[in-house]
Amino acid sequence: MVDHISPRASPGPIRSSQTRRARKLRDSCTSCASSKVRCTKEKPACARCIERGLACQYMVSKRMGRNPRAPSPLDSTRRPSESLPSAGSEQGLPAHNTYSTPHAHTQAHTHAHSHPQPHPQSHPQSNQPPHALPTPNGSSSVSAIFSHQSPPPLVETQGLGGDLAGQAQSTLSSLTVDSEFGGSLQSMEHGNHADFLAESTGSLFDAFLEVGTPMIDPFLESAPLPPFQARYCCFSLALQTLTCLFPHAPLGCQLRLTDGEDSSCNLMTTDMVISGNKKATDAVRKILGCSCAQDGYLLSMVVLIVLKVLGWYAAAAGTQCTSTAAGGETNSGSCSNSPATVSSGCLTEERVLHHPSMVGEDCVDEEDQPRVAAQLVLSELHRVQSLANLLAKRLQEGGDDAAGIPAHHPASPFSLLGFSGLEANLRHRLRAVSSDIIDYLHRE
């Protein structure tokens, strides 16, 4: 009766429970806790202490943990796949506290039984972190993380401090992670940086594009881009007006000779000159009525436009050279490009054809054509006179603004003396054109 002892009377389980409670350690080692950084919770030494060469010690926890509870039906269904000890725990090697899947633990269990003394699997040197401990099932666990969309089940931690680590993992598992980004971030938290970088990131980017990329209307993708449009302002209007006043290339222009284009025969008539100058004066009046006219560069361009308009009026009236006033046919009106046939006084860019049958709305004879053209131009000079008065006001304002600016300062192209010279030159040119036309009419 005394020789046979029932197994239920053995105090073994009580001693093991007391021993497990007595050996319960904290989650963070002493070094990580003193530095207030997150510990990887690896035993016997964490990755941070191994990397820094520190002594990794885990102090005994003051809390004994929860009392053991009765196993639930849900635990009994998960117990066969979760309670398999890893090969690292059998050999005394630490195992990573990472999330895993039943498929991964099945592979780990197969390796543990087929190899009594397992060795770490051979991986490329670039995939192994320099501070990580070798784990037989690390590669399969990481690959299982990236290959499953559903949240991984809970894994019981083997070794020291299993209860408290299991509570921490159960808290983390309550957070819903329903994308591959969650698994990758959890793998990064547990120190598997090299394994995370070694995995293919194509599926991660595909998942991101499916969720975060907005849909683009196919019509918008196929729509052509709008044509380039230049900025329209007073400066662009002044440049366009000045360009229209130069329809012909000069006789000695190298570009005209290189391109082979001859525009000397495309002469303008008196009606074309009157119409073009009217458009130019309207554009100048619009520019001078804008606040942009206070700019010195724009005022300089306006002065050039008005001077060019006066040049075309003089050419239409036939008062540019003596040969034009004396005879109806001029050298500039011919299609000859030879400079020797044109006198030096008639080498001008404003070339007007003086042989039309119509001048304005009147049909005139060939003999009366120069006189009628001169009278028509003289009647149009009032436009230039009003522009000269308005421009003089703007030039005076620009000169007042430039009074305190040095002559070499880039804020204004001319000094006060330069603006005064522009006004004087413009008025002198206007008086010269009008007096030449009046003298020509008196001679006729």
From Swiss-Prot:
Keywords for the protein's UniProt record, in alphabetical order: DNA-binding, Endosome, Metal-binding, Nucleus, Transcription, Transcription regulation, Zinc
SMART domains given in the database record: GAL4 (SM00066)
Keyword Zinc belongs to the record: yes
Broad class of where this protein is predominantly found: nucleus
Biased segments, Basic residues type: 106-116
Region span, Disordered: 1-26, 64-167
Ranges of Polar residues composition bias in the record: 136-149
Pfam families reported for this sequence: AflR, Zn_clus
Listed Low complexity bias regions: 120-130
Protein's UniProt keywords contain Nucleus: yes
One GO location term (cellular component): nucleus
Residue range(s) of DNA binding per entry: 29-56
GO molecular function, one term: zinc ion binding
One GO term (biological process): aflatoxin biosynthetic process
Localisation: Nucleus; Endosome
Top-level taxonomic group: Eukaryota
Inducing factors: Expression is positively regulated by the developmental and secondary metabolism regulator veA. Expression is repressed during Streptomyces-Aspergillus interactions. Expression is also repressed by curcumin.
Physiological role: Transcription factor involved in regulation of the aflatoxin biosynthesis gene cluster. Binds with its co-regulator aflS to AFLR1 elements (5'-TCGSWNNSCGR-3') present in the promoters of the aflatoxin cluster genes. The ratio of the expression data between aflS:aflR plays a crucial role in the regulation of aflatoxins production. A high ratio, produced at a range between 17 and 30 degrees Celsius, corresponds with the production profile of aflatoxin G1 biosynthesis. A low ratio, produced over 30 degrees Celsius, is related to aflatoxin B1 biosynthesis.
PANTHER family according to UniProt: MONODICTYPHENONE CLUSTER TRANSCRIPTION FACTOR-RELATED, OLEATE-ACTIVATED TRANSCRIPTION FACTOR 1-RELATED
Name of the protein this chain belongs to: Aflatoxin biosynthesis regulatory protein
Phylogenetic classification of the source organism: Eukaryota, Fungi, Dikarya, Ascomycota, Pezizomycotina
Name of the encoding gene: aflR
